[in-house]
Amino acid sequence: MAKERDQNTKDKNLLICFLWNFSAELKLALMALLVLCTLATLLPFLPSSFSISASELRFCISRIAVNSTSVNFTTVVEKPVLDNAVKLTEKPVLDNGVTKQPLTEEKVLNNGVIKRTFTGYGWAAYNFVLMNAYRGGVNTFAVIGLSSKPLHVYSHPTYRCEWIPLNQSDNRILTDGTKILTDWGYGRVYTTVVVNCTFPSNTVINPKNTGGTLLLHATTGDTDRNITDSIPVLTETPNTVDFALYESNLRRREKYDYLYCGSSLYGNLSPQRIREWIAYHVRFFGERSHFVLHDAGGITEEVFEVLKPWIELGRVTVHDIREQERFDGYYHNQFMVVNDCLHRYRFMAKWMFFFDVDEFIYVPAKSSISSVMVSLEEYSQFTIEQMPMSSQLCYDGDGPARTYRKWGFEKLAYRDVKKVPRRDRKYAVQPRNVFATGVHMSQHLQGKTYHRAEGKIRYFHYHGSISQRREPCRHLYNGTRIVHENNPYVLDTTMRDIGLAVKTFEIRTIGDRLLRTRQ
């Protein structure tokens, strides 16, 4: 019993010593518990307008976090990381994504003038938006992308190109980049920029085929600060460059005789009109042709089903470019898209054609596309004259029932003959001679351009017909010359006469899987 009593006494003394040593902490904990209980008691009696939202709470916490971590920076670097640890861009950025700026205060000068200061935050538009870059020769590259339109109109941004070999023992090479603005003044928030990186003529870039990275140093032209973005635009891995491709004396035949570069396809497109267009042109250009289409939201599931048979045959390639909608450029950035197509397929085709999916290329009956192109071989570019067709006036020579069952280019047979100063043209180029291109022609090429090919080749334009998801015939006529809404038209059955041959070609090539295609 005495032993048990002594043990209890020792335990009580130990507890008292523990409480005495931590009395301050216990007081703080008890005070906090008392405050929480008080708040819990008073909250039901507070007015309903008093509230703290979750967003406000997050804001307060984030402000505390930013203030308490004044040196918490992160380096933002995307795109390929170089194997030889070359530093690309190292910009101190706060956790909330805002670049830290040195704070400046206004001053009163000795003469009494108040000197004001201006500090910029964030970006209204990106300095450069990269789409892709391509090798154009043994010492030249092309970089295609977007940049701020006001920046190029009102400032003087510059570009420098740097080749960084994968082998650290090789020297880096720098050269000035030449910018080409291709949009003819049509840009919006963004404009298309093609940067030509041509190194000295006696220099071969990556001569041992050991690999390397091309950097584009893009400046904003700021007169006060040297703001430069270093962007890795192209990485060549070892033994991937085919230098024979760029030797003129070893030039081999291209994979395609004719390659179609399409502009951005957007909107609610008619599957039937796309079906007619692709079947017509696959037949027209022949076996050694290819079609590159760019989906900016216009290739829906129904349209893709029309293209699918031709994709499976290797005649069509579709590029999904919907992400470019983030950057507000002219007509869904079509200038950037066609320039990317030009340089991507530059060494794969002898001729490239640029026109729209509501336009049909035509050569006279006694000619062929191959004979016409041979006659124009001395030119780097030729333009194609437009034949404007009505997209709502149909020829009713076979009666309404048969007319409505015909394809669009068969029944839309009335040509607009109103005299106008000029009409838009489309064009074709030999891509090896072109540095940058546009929508209606290229202004940046070497060699001659031919503008009088209307006797050799033309195109029929059914403006707006591609975006009509209904029967195109709004009015039926039988006459050879008519006037509709004070506009003169003549009957032109050129395309109508080819319809049966195109339908037969489609059936023989891909079968009857598209017979139930809807408007």
Curated annotation (Swiss-Prot):
Disruption phenotype: No visible phenotype under normal growth conditions, but mutant plants have reduced content of beta-1,4-galactan in leaf cell wall. GO terms for biological process: cell wall biogenesis; cell wall organization. Residues 257-471 form the GT92 domain. It is a single-pass membrane protein. It is found in: Golgi apparatus membrane. Keywords: Cell wall biogenesis/degradation, Glycosyltransferase, Golgi apparatus, Membrane, Transferase, Transmembrane, Transmembrane helix. Expressed in the midrib of mature leaves, root vasculature, flower filaments, siliques and seeds. Its main location: Golgi. This is Galactan beta-1,4-galactosyltransferase GALS2. It comes from Arabidopsis thaliana (Mouse-ear cress). The lineage of its organism: Eukaryota, Viridiplantae, Streptophyta, Embryophyta, Tracheophyta. The gene is GALS2.
